[in-house]
Amino acid sequence: MINVTLKGGVVKEFEAGVSAADVAKSIGAGLYRSACAARVDGEACDLRTALDKDCQLEILTFEDKDGRHAFWHTAAHIMAQAIQHLYPAAKFGIGPALDDGWYYDIGGTAPFTPDQFEAIEAEMKKIVKADLPVEKRFITVEEGREIFKGQDYKLELLEEYAEKGWQLSVYTQGDFTDLCAGPHLMSTGAVKAVKLLSAASAYWRGDAARDSLCRMYGTAFPKASELEAHLAMLEEAKKRDHRKLGKELELFTLLEEGPGFPFFLPKGMTLKNTLIDYWREVHHRAGYQEISTPIILSRKLWERSGHWDHYKDNMYTTVIDEEDFAIKPMNCPGGMLVYKTKPRSYRDLPLRVGELGLVHRHELSGALHGLMRVRCFTQDDAHIFMTPDQIKDEIKGVVQLIDQVYSLFGFEYHIELSTMPEDHIGELADWEVATDALRQAIEELGRTYEINEGDGAFYGPKLDFHLVDAIGRTWQCGTIQLDMQMPERFELEYTGEDGQKHRPVMIHRVVFGSIERFIGILIEHFAGAFPTWLAPEQVRVIPIAEAHRGYAQEIERQLDAAGVRVSADLRNEKMGYKIREGQLQRIPYMLVVGAKEMEDGTVSVRARKEENGGVMTLDAFTEMIQKEIAARER
């Protein structure tokens, strides 16, 4: 018999060899029906997995991230099977689950078009109706060569995995078999509602010198109503697309002369600088000091930090005076050098140092996406150097700072604890200490979190903060990384109370993450209708006729002197046209002025939230908007 510890600490006894599915069935029929996968001792696996020793078991449904991934991964296989039925010459690349569906890269046929989606979906529904068992088995490389004969991309992956010494496994459902590690659903019948979304081109393995494949995107849900809600969200997302709104609102542009390098226009710079001013204000109050470090630094520094060995493929390099240099992809090593500029004492700690550093990372051209995925961005890094007994309090302080910032914009969020990856530096014992410190701090704050196994940075575990925007999408922005490796590599020291030299512990952390990406998220979150304090243009003055232009200009001067971002629309256009344009520009307030307003020294207010804001004296309006801006109201 074995003891299985379930969620909530309940321990149940089962015979060795019981499957995770059988355990789910013993808990309740409802859980069994909704189960997608399992997590055994922290690792996601199939429900068919046999439990042969004492373990911790969590049954994963579509409500769990890993459960959704198993669901969508199975749906990707169903799509591939349908395509295999309809287009036997198709050759399959990779087909991973994403955060809201899946894609599959397919060659061997002409690229698919939306006209073909309906037939593929119909074939998928047949496979779902057949409720085919999805079964995993382990194979040898020789068996794999036979199974995937003629499937060139699969054979390439097979040989690569075998060379790395990985255990090879396949999943079979009916007449379709795929090279895959899983996990998957137990059968195809649970995928009730499917939708193919789009097709795009993608190079095999992201290499422009390799074959161009058709990347098919799709999504699926257990219920048709859930699919309908998701498709409605996608339609809303199209309207909010930051690339579209960024152009319409004249915030930024993307040019072929700089792929992945955004150009910020005057209004976009106003927005960016407003965010930066706020960042500086809250960090000053939280006891941070701001620094700036060079963009280009010597190869020796990157070798010392570990980036040259672990991150070089993402770095831009150059040669200066016959010596290798790199444009910084991260701010951390520069922060280490700043710490070393003078001797440090325990009395100096914790030392909180912030930097709005411009970093460059080489991203594949196919991965670039507006401001969300770029090659050049401003990272709001901070590094906190501390003694071991200060770790928990400093982590708590950062969590509270992140909460303060996200709450200002109306974001809810959830937290993930990411643990040691395969490619890491440092001793296991140090990783365990660092991971436990993050866990204890977050638990003492009463915050819930999920474990994200193996997704830590190469130098330490981290807490990732995932925002939920106005239409329910999640975005990973804030990060707290606890690092005991970098201080060792850079030989950082402080003099302790005992007069001896000690090694500080360090936190890397960001709040916005990439400021450019955060702006993209804000554009979509607010659909371009920014809160007044953040809006690039807060007020537009519209004279009714030419005779009122002088009064409009006087209002513009007075509001500008009061610190309000204002413009007067003096064009020879109809008032209705000007008002409509102001609405399209999402300007918080329009002040319409004519003969009566000019005579009375008033303004007719049209607020974005309520079209008729009434008539006010200019002084009263100025006082009102100044208070709104100062309070940073949403």
Where are these predicted regions, by residue range?
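NTP/phosphate- and nucleic-acid-binding module
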Residues: 1-91, 99, 105-634
